[in-house]
Curated annotation (Swiss-Prot):
One of its GO terms (molecular function) is toxin activity. It comes from Momordica balsamina. This is Ribosome-inactivating protein momordin II. The lineage of its organism: Eukaryota, Viridiplantae, Streptophyta, Embryophyta, Tracheophyta. The keyword Signal applies. The active site is at 181.
Amino acid sequence: MVKCLLLSFLIIAIFIGVPTAKGDVNFDLSTATAKTYTKFIEDFRATLPFSHKVYDIPLLYSTISDSRRFILLDLTSYAYETISVAIDVTNVYVVAYRTRDVSYFFKESPPEAYNILFKGTRKITLPYTGNYENLQTAAHKIRENIDLGLPALSSAITTLFYYNAQSAPSALLVLIQTTAEAARFKYIERHVAKYVATNFKPNLAIISLENQWSALSKQIFLAQNQGGKFRNPVDLIKPTGERFQVTNVDSDVVKGNIKLLLNSRASTADENFITTMTLLGESVVN
Protein backbone atom coordinates (compact mmCIF):
# COMPACT_ATOMS: atom_id res chain seq x y z
CA MET A 1 0.00 0.00 0.00
CA VAL A 2 2.82 2.38 0.96
CA LYS A 3 4.67 1.56 -2.29
CA CYS A 4 1.53 2.32 -4.30
CA LEU A 5 1.16 5.69 -2.58
CA LEU A 6 4.80 6.57 -3.19
CA LEU A 7 4.47 5.60 -6.85
CA SER A 8 1.34 7.72 -7.17
CA PHE A 9 3.10 10.77 -5.69
CA LEU A 10 6.05 10.23 -8.03
CA ILE A 11 3.79 10.08 -11.08
CA ILE A 12 1.97 13.25 -9.99
CA ALA A 13 5.26 15.07 -9.41
CA ILE A 14 6.54 14.10 -12.85
CA PHE A 15 3.29 15.19 -14.48
CA ILE A 16 3.16 18.55 -12.73
CA GLY A 17 6.84 19.38 -12.88
CA VAL A 18 8.78 20.76 -9.95
CA PRO A 19 6.57 20.80 -6.86
CA THR A 20 6.21 24.15 -5.12
CA ALA A 21 4.43 25.40 -2.04
CA LYS A 22 1.05 27.00 -2.52
CA GLY A 23 1.10 30.78 -2.70
CA ASP A 24 0.45 32.92 0.36
CA VAL A 25 -2.33 34.65 -1.58
CA ASN A 26 -4.23 33.27 -4.58
CA PHE A 27 -6.36 34.88 -7.28
CA ASP A 28 -8.21 32.99 -10.00
CA LEU A 29 -9.27 35.19 -12.91
CA SER A 30 -11.46 32.46 -14.40
CA THR A 31 -14.02 33.15 -11.65
CA ALA A 32 -13.07 36.76 -10.88
CA THR A 33 -15.49 39.51 -9.94
CA ALA A 34 -14.94 43.01 -8.60
CA LYS A 35 -15.49 41.61 -5.10
CA THR A 36 -13.01 38.75 -5.45
CA TYR A 37 -10.37 41.10 -6.86
CA THR A 38 -10.89 43.50 -3.95
CA LYS A 39 -10.65 40.57 -1.52
CA PHE A 40 -7.43 39.43 -3.21
CA ILE A 41 -5.83 42.86 -2.78
CA GLU A 42 -7.01 43.06 0.84
CA ASP A 43 -5.57 39.60 1.54
CA PHE A 44 -2.33 40.64 -0.18
CA ARG A 45 -2.00 43.67 2.10
CA ALA A 46 -2.84 41.60 5.18
CA THR A 47 0.00 39.19 4.36
CA LEU A 48 2.63 41.95 4.47
CA PRO A 49 4.30 42.29 7.90
CA PHE A 50 4.65 45.82 9.23
CA SER A 51 6.47 47.61 12.03
CA HIS A 52 3.65 49.82 13.28
CA LYS A 53 1.08 52.24 11.92
CA VAL A 54 1.68 55.87 11.08
CA TYR A 55 -1.56 57.84 10.81
CA ASP A 56 -3.30 54.46 10.72
CA ILE A 57 -1.24 53.32 7.70
CA PRO A 58 1.00 50.23 8.06
CA LEU A 59 4.70 51.12 7.91
CA LEU A 60 6.60 48.28 6.25
CA TYR A 61 9.75 46.88 7.83
CA SER A 62 12.98 48.29 6.39
CA THR A 63 14.71 44.97 7.07
CA ILE A 64 13.42 41.53 7.94
CA SER A 65 14.80 38.01 8.29
CA ASP A 66 15.43 36.11 5.06
CA SER A 67 12.82 33.50 5.98
CA ARG A 68 10.11 36.20 6.01
CA ARG A 69 11.49 38.38 3.20
CA PHE A 70 9.23 37.17 0.38
CA ILE A 71 5.62 36.14 -0.14
CA LEU A 72 4.09 34.40 -3.14
CA LEU A 73 1.02 35.37 -5.14
CA ASP A 74 -0.48 32.54 -7.19
CA LEU A 75 -2.31 34.05 -10.17
CA THR A 76 -4.44 32.00 -12.56
CA SER A 77 -5.55 33.21 -16.01
CA TYR A 78 -8.86 32.68 -17.80
CA ALA A 79 -7.21 29.67 -19.46
CA TYR A 80 -6.20 28.17 -16.06
CA GLU A 81 -2.50 28.97 -16.48
CA THR A 82 -0.92 29.72 -13.09
CA ILE A 83 2.19 31.70 -12.26
CA SER A 84 3.69 32.31 -8.81
CA VAL A 85 4.86 35.88 -8.26
CA ALA A 86 7.43 36.66 -5.55
CA ILE A 87 6.98 39.92 -3.63
CA ASP A 88 9.62 41.54 -1.42
CA VAL A 89 7.69 42.44 1.76
CA THR A 90 10.01 45.36 2.62
CA ASN A 91 8.93 47.40 -0.40
CA VAL A 92 6.18 45.43 -2.22
CA TYR A 93 8.41 45.03 -5.27
CA VAL A 94 7.88 42.17 -7.68
CA VAL A 95 11.26 40.42 -7.75
CA ALA A 96 10.61 37.19 -9.68
CA TYR A 97 7.99 34.78 -10.93
CA ARG A 98 7.75 31.06 -11.62
CA THR A 99 5.97 29.17 -14.36
CA ARG A 100 6.11 25.38 -14.14
CA ASP A 101 9.80 24.42 -13.73
CA VAL A 102 11.33 27.75 -14.81
CA SER A 103 11.66 30.95 -12.78
CA TYR A 104 12.49 34.46 -13.98
CA PHE A 105 14.23 37.11 -11.88
CA PHE A 106 14.58 40.84 -12.47
CA LYS A 107 18.18 41.88 -13.04
CA GLU A 108 18.39 43.80 -9.74
CA SER A 109 16.71 41.14 -7.57
CA PRO A 110 18.47 40.83 -4.19
CA PRO A 111 20.84 37.86 -3.73
CA GLU A 112 18.51 36.46 -1.08
CA ALA A 113 15.83 36.05 -3.72
CA TYR A 114 17.98 33.71 -5.81
CA ASN A 115 18.88 31.68 -2.74
CA ILE A 116 15.41 31.37 -1.24
CA LEU A 117 12.87 31.47 -4.05
CA PHE A 118 11.73 28.74 -6.42
CA LYS A 119 14.24 26.08 -5.48
CA GLY A 120 14.52 23.25 -7.98
CA THR A 121 13.59 25.44 -10.94
CA ARG A 122 15.80 26.60 -13.78
CA LYS A 123 16.50 30.23 -12.88
CA ILE A 124 16.73 32.85 -15.61
CA THR A 125 17.75 36.49 -15.10
CA LEU A 126 15.71 38.90 -17.19
CA PRO A 127 17.67 41.47 -19.26
CA TYR A 128 16.06 44.42 -17.43
CA THR A 129 15.26 45.61 -13.92
CA GLY A 130 11.85 46.18 -12.34
CA ASN A 131 12.39 49.91 -12.74
CA TYR A 132 9.48 51.47 -14.64
CA GLU A 133 11.80 53.35 -17.00
CA ASN A 134 13.68 50.12 -17.79
CA LEU A 135 10.48 48.15 -18.39
CA GLN A 136 8.96 50.86 -20.57
CA THR A 137 12.12 50.98 -22.67
CA ALA A 138 12.05 47.20 -23.08
CA ALA A 139 8.33 47.29 -23.91
CA HIS A 140 8.73 50.25 -26.31
CA LYS A 141 5.67 51.71 -24.60
CA ILE A 142 4.94 54.02 -21.70
CA ARG A 143 2.48 52.98 -19.01
CA GLU A 144 -0.17 55.41 -20.24
CA ASN A 145 -0.43 53.36 -23.46
CA ILE A 146 -0.68 49.90 -21.86
CA ASP A 147 -4.10 48.48 -21.00
CA LEU A 148 -4.96 47.59 -17.42
CA GLY A 149 -7.98 45.68 -16.09
CA LEU A 150 -8.70 42.05 -15.29
CA PRO A 151 -8.71 40.92 -18.96
CA ALA A 152 -5.31 42.61 -19.36
CA LEU A 153 -4.03 40.86 -16.23
CA SER A 154 -5.19 37.48 -17.56
CA SER A 155 -3.41 38.12 -20.86
CA ALA A 156 -0.28 39.16 -18.96
CA ILE A 157 -0.32 35.91 -16.99
CA THR A 158 -0.58 33.92 -20.23
CA THR A 159 2.32 35.87 -21.76
CA LEU A 160 4.49 35.25 -18.70
CA PHE A 161 3.40 31.60 -18.39
CA TYR A 162 4.73 30.82 -21.88
CA TYR A 163 7.36 33.58 -21.65
CA ASN A 164 7.11 35.60 -24.83
CA ALA A 165 10.31 37.68 -24.63
CA GLN A 166 8.92 40.48 -26.80
CA SER A 167 5.68 40.86 -24.83
CA ALA A 168 7.03 40.09 -21.34
CA PRO A 169 7.99 43.69 -20.39
CA SER A 170 4.47 44.97 -21.12
CA ALA A 171 3.00 41.99 -19.28
CA LEU A 172 5.17 42.73 -16.24
CA LEU A 173 4.03 46.36 -16.26
CA VAL A 174 0.42 45.14 -16.17
CA LEU A 175 1.21 42.64 -13.42
CA ILE A 176 2.98 45.20 -11.21
CA GLN A 177 0.26 47.82 -11.49
CA THR A 178 -2.69 45.48 -10.92
CA THR A 179 -1.08 43.82 -7.88
CA ALA A 180 1.65 45.81 -6.08
CA GLU A 181 0.38 49.29 -6.97
CA ALA A 182 -3.20 48.32 -6.17
CA ALA A 183 -2.00 47.13 -2.76
CA ARG A 184 -0.30 50.48 -2.13
CA PHE A 185 -3.19 52.66 -3.26
CA LYS A 186 -6.94 52.19 -2.77
CA TYR A 187 -7.56 54.51 -5.74
CA ILE A 188 -5.74 52.12 -8.08
CA GLU A 189 -7.40 49.06 -6.55
CA ARG A 190 -10.88 50.58 -7.07
CA HIS A 191 -10.07 51.61 -10.61
CA VAL A 192 -8.95 48.11 -11.61
CA ALA A 193 -11.96 46.53 -9.85
CA LYS A 194 -14.30 48.52 -12.13
CA TYR A 195 -12.88 46.75 -15.18
CA VAL A 196 -13.78 43.09 -14.78
CA ALA A 197 -14.78 42.51 -18.41
CA THR A 198 -13.00 45.36 -20.21
CA ASN A 199 -9.67 47.18 -20.07
CA PHE A 200 -8.66 50.80 -19.56
CA LYS A 201 -5.62 53.01 -20.00
CA PRO A 202 -4.23 54.36 -16.70
CA ASN A 203 -4.88 58.05 -16.20
CA LEU A 204 -2.29 60.58 -15.06
CA ALA A 205 -3.55 60.38 -11.47
CA ILE A 206 -2.63 56.68 -11.36
CA ILE A 207 0.78 57.27 -12.94
CA SER A 208 1.64 60.13 -10.57
CA LEU A 209 0.63 58.10 -7.50
CA GLU A 210 2.85 55.24 -8.66
CA ASN A 211 5.75 57.64 -9.18
CA GLN A 212 5.34 59.36 -5.83
CA TRP A 213 4.78 56.48 -3.37
CA SER A 214 8.28 56.89 -1.96
CA ALA A 215 7.93 60.66 -1.57
CA LEU A 216 4.48 60.37 0.00
CA SER A 217 5.71 57.70 2.42
CA LYS A 218 8.61 59.90 3.49
CA GLN A 219 6.48 62.98 4.08
CA ILE A 220 3.78 61.08 5.99
CA PHE A 221 6.46 59.62 8.24
CA LEU A 222 8.06 63.03 8.86
CA ALA A 223 4.66 64.63 9.49
CA GLN A 224 4.53 62.90 12.88
CA ASN A 225 6.86 65.62 14.20
CA GLN A 226 5.29 68.37 12.11
CA GLY A 227 1.72 68.35 13.43
CA GLY A 228 0.56 66.40 10.41
CA LYS A 229 2.11 68.81 7.91
CA PHE A 230 4.51 67.67 5.20
CA ARG A 231 8.03 69.03 5.42
CA ASN A 232 8.02 69.28 1.63
CA PRO A 233 4.89 69.22 -0.56
CA VAL A 234 4.42 66.30 -2.94
CA ASP A 235 3.41 67.05 -6.52
CA LEU A 236 0.64 64.93 -8.03
CA ILE A 237 -1.64 65.07 -11.07
CA LYS A 238 -5.43 64.85 -11.20
CA PRO A 239 -7.22 62.62 -13.76
CA THR A 240 -7.89 65.81 -15.76
CA GLY A 241 -4.16 66.49 -16.03
CA GLU A 242 -4.22 69.36 -13.53
CA ARG A 243 -1.22 69.44 -11.21
CA PHE A 244 -1.62 69.94 -7.46
CA GLN A 245 0.33 69.57 -4.23
CA VAL A 246 -0.29 67.39 -1.19
CA THR A 247 0.86 69.22 1.94
CA ASN A 248 -0.55 67.32 4.93
CA VAL A 249 -1.92 64.00 6.16
CA ASP A 250 -5.52 65.26 6.06
CA SER A 251 -5.50 65.25 2.27
CA ASP A 252 -7.87 62.81 0.55
CA VAL A 253 -4.81 61.49 -1.26
CA VAL A 254 -3.55 60.22 2.10
CA LYS A 255 -6.69 59.40 4.09
CA GLY A 256 -8.29 56.15 2.96
CA ASN A 257 -6.11 55.95 -0.15
CA ILE A 258 -2.52 55.15 0.84
CA LYS A 259 -2.60 51.66 2.34
CA LEU A 260 1.12 50.95 2.82
CA LEU A 261 4.12 53.10 3.68
CA LEU A 262 7.66 52.50 2.47
CA ASN A 263 10.06 52.45 5.41
CA SER A 264 13.57 53.89 5.79
CA ARG A 265 16.77 52.78 7.49
CA ALA A 266 17.02 56.07 9.39
CA SER A 267 16.72 55.90 13.17
CA THR A 268 15.29 59.39 13.57
CA ALA A 269 12.91 61.54 11.56
CA ASP A 270 15.30 64.36 10.70
CA GLU A 271 16.86 65.84 7.59
CA ASN A 272 18.94 62.69 7.21
CA PHE A 273 15.83 60.61 6.53
CA ILE A 274 16.93 58.09 3.93
CA THR A 275 14.37 56.27 1.84
CA THR A 276 14.98 52.77 0.57
CA MET A 277 14.66 54.02 -2.98
CA THR A 278 15.32 57.30 -4.73
CA LEU A 279 12.62 58.96 -6.79
CA LEU A 280 14.02 60.34 -10.03
CA GLY A 281 11.11 61.31 -12.21
CA GLU A 282 10.00 58.25 -14.14
CA SER A 283 12.87 56.19 -12.74
CA VAL A 284 10.79 54.42 -10.13
CA VAL A 285 11.18 50.80 -9.15
CA ASN A 286 7.94 48.81 -9.12
